[in-house]
UniProtKB/Swiss-Prot annotation:
The lineage of its organism: Viruses, Varidnaviria, Bamfordvirae, Preplasmiviricota, Tectiliviricetes. Changing residue 265 to P: Loss of antiapoptotic function. It is found in: Host nucleus. This is Protein GAM-1. Its main location: host cell. It comes from the Viruses.
Amino acid sequence: MARNPFRMFPGDLPYYMGTISFTSVVPVDPSQRNPTTSLREMVTTGLIFNPNLTGEQLREYSFSPLVSMGRKAIFADYEGPQRIIHVTIRGRSAEPKTPSEALIMMEKAVRGAFAVPDWVAREYSDPLPHGITHVGDLGFPIGSVHALKMALDTLKIHVPRGVGVPGYEGLCGTTTIKAPRQYRLLTTGVFTKKDLKRTLPEPFFSRFFNQTPEVCAIKTGKNPFSTEIWCMTLGGDSPAPERNEPRNPHSLQDWARLGVMETCLRMSRRGLGSRHHPYHSL
């Protein structure tokens, strides 16, 4: 699996801009068990050769995609099974940007993330966003009308308010969640702080989490036993240590926040409604 783009590595641009996420489908190829590597390379190629970005902008900004597989899906108008794919792209910049500047740049990057053939664009009933149609392998391959509709319906751009601060390395953890017996087919593999805000009471949320909506968990895998594996992330309060220096231990409050996020994530994936709030009594 590709490296986690929610962690900082040496050489990464320091300032975090936001994330682009969408869900689509690709045909199931029996000879290729894990297509995430090739799909990630296609998305990266489409972002690099995006006609809306100049060479100077490509040096000033970086976009790191993460591709994970979902469950299989069968459509009535298509022969053969297909695989649901979740794509998340994280953007960074060399200089601090305002939220409006970051949003404009993320919208430009979206136009290079898809590879839509002409016949799919012609058969699609609704108008396409400007500049999103590209012919060839430059971007995520859209091979059918329902794949394009799914990608556009689930397309989200997350730009936090505090994009002018360095993206310090935060606390990461994984959790395994049993999939519910019945749930909607088109489910995005992203869990945001907006979802936390809907689950937690306002005083509790304000005391433990920032108000900026950003991605805090993403589904990274699904095993044959109908369970999902999610990677949860929390922004760090202090910069990451330099090389060969000891790491600063995370506080007990950070570990408590990670546990709260895991509980809310489990509730969301099991389909519990707004009446189930285990933290309202605190």
